[in-house]
C-alpha cells in the first residue's frame, strides 16, 4: 500500500490482550470490520471514524509532506507529526548560527513561526471505490505502445473522466489520485485538498527527537521524543494559498483532543494514517529477489554513500547541517534493508 493512502491500522486490545493487527481501507470499515471492532470495544459510531459526506476522524488526520502522517490538534491548524517527518524542514531552517537540528526550535508567538517552502499538508476529502468504472475504461481504452497502460499518467486521466462524469467539484487546490490495490483487483480514487503555506512551530533538539539515531531506528520499544509541530495557514477565506504575510491560521473543520488520562490495559485502540506500503502478497521468488537484489544493493550502495557523507559532515558543521536530512533519508531504508533480510533469514521464510 502506498504512502499516499489513508488507512486504519488496528491493534485491538481486549482483556486477554489479543491483537487483531492489519491495515484496512477506511471506506470498507463498516462492511468488513465494524462488528469485530464493536466486540473489541469500539464505542463511537463507525461513521465518526470515516464519513465521506460529513465530519469524521479522517478530517483531522493529514498527509504530511511526501509520506508521513500528521494530526490536527487545535482549531487553528496546529499539526503534530514525527520529528523524523519534520526533519527536512528543521534542516531547511538551520544554519551554523541557528542550528535548530541540534538546539531545537520553539516559536513563542505566531510571528515567529517559520514559513517552509515546498512543504505541503493534504486533507483527504473522499475515498471512492471506482473499481467497476476503471475496469470499464480498461476494456474501452487501447494502448498500442503498452507504455502508459496503468501508469500514473493513465490513471490520472481516468480519474479526471470519473470526476467529470460524477460532477465532483474541483478547485485549484483539489488533487485527484487514483490508485490500484491488491494487484489491480481494486481501485480507489482519493479526492484531496492540499495546503502549501505550512509553518514550523516547534521541534525538540535532536538529542530528544532523534535519540538513539540509527542504532534505535526500526527497533522497539523506543525512547525517542519523536515529535515536531507545524501550523497550516490559508487565505482569509480559509482557502489554500501560497505563502503570504496576509494568510491566517486555518480554522479546521475538526481537530483531535489529547486525553491526559492515558491508556489502560484492555482499552480499544486503533491508529489512522499513511503507513507506507506492504508486500504481503509476494510470492517466494519475489521475496528472494527483494533479499538478494533490492536489499543487497540498497545496503551496500547506501552504506558506501553514507560513509562518504559522514566523513565530510564530521569535518564541517555547515556540511553536517546541509546533508543531515539527505543522510537520514538514506540511512532509514539502509537500516530497513539490513533488518528485513536478517528477519527473513531468522524466520526461515524461504
Residue ranges: model-predicted function:
Residues 1-4:
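Positively charged n-region of N-terminal signal peptides that target proteins for export
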Residues 16-350:
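Terminal presequence/propeptide segments associated with secretion/organelle targeting
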Amino acid at each position: 500500500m502506498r504512502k499516499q493512502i489513508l488507512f486504519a491500522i488496528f491493534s485491538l486490545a481486549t482483556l486477554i490482550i489479543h491483537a487483531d493487527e492489519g491495515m484496512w481501507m477506511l471506506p470498507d470499515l463498516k462492511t468488513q470490520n465494524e462488528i469485530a471492532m464493536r466486540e473489541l470495544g469500539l464505542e463511537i459510531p463507525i461513521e465518526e471514524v470515516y464519513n465521506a459526506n460529513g465530519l469524521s476522524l479522517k478530517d483531522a488526520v493529514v498527509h504530511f509532506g511526501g509520506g508521513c502522517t500528521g494530526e490536527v490538534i487545535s482549531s487553528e491548524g496546529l499539526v503534530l507529526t514525527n520529528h523524523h517527518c519534520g526533519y527536512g524542514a528543521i534542516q531547511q531552517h538551520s544554519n551554523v548560527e541557528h542550528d535548530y537540528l541540534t538546539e531545537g526550535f520553539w516559536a513563542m508567538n505566531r510571528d515567529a513561526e517559520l514559513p517552509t517552502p515546498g512543504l505541503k499538508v493534504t486533507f483527504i476529502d473522499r475515498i471512492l471505490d471506482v473499481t467497476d468504472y476503471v475496469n470499464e475504461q480498461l476494456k474501452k481504452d487501447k494502448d498500442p505502445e503498452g507504455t502508459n497502460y496503468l501508469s500514473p499518467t493513465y490513471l490520472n486521466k481516468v480519474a479526471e473522466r470519473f470526476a467529470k462524469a460524477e460532477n465532483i467539484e474541483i478547485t485549484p487546490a483539489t488533487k485527484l489520485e487514483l490508485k490500484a490495490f491488491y494487484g489491480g483487483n481494486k481501485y480507489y480514487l482519493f479526492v484531496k485538498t492540499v495546503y502549501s503555506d505550512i509553518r514550523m512551530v516547534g521541534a525538540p533538539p535532536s538529542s530528544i527527537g532523534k535519540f538513539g539515531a540509527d542504532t534505535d531506528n526500526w527497533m522497539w520499544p523506543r525512547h525517542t521524543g519523536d515529535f515536531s509541530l507545524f501550523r497550516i495557514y490559508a487565505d482569509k477565506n480559509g482557502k489554500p494559498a501560497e505563502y503570504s504575510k496576509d494568510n491566517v491560521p486555518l480554522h479546521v473543520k475538526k481537530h483531535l483532543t489529547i486525553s491526559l488520562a492515558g491508556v489502560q490495559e484492555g482499552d480499544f485502540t486503533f491508529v489512522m494514517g499513511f503507513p507506507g506500503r506492504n508486500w504481503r502478497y509476494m510470492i517466494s521468488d519475489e521475496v528472494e529477489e527483494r533479499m538478494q537484489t533490492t536489499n543487497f544493493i540498497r545496503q551496500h550502495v547506501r552504506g558506501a554513500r553514507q560513509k562518504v557523507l559522514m566523513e565530510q559532515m564530521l569535518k564541517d558543521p555547515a556540511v553536517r547541517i546541509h546533508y543531515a536530512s539527505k543522510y537520514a533519508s538514506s540511512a532509514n531504508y539502509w537500516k530497513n534493508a539490513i533488518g528485513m533480510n536478517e528477519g527473513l533469514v531468522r524466520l526461515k521464510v524461504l
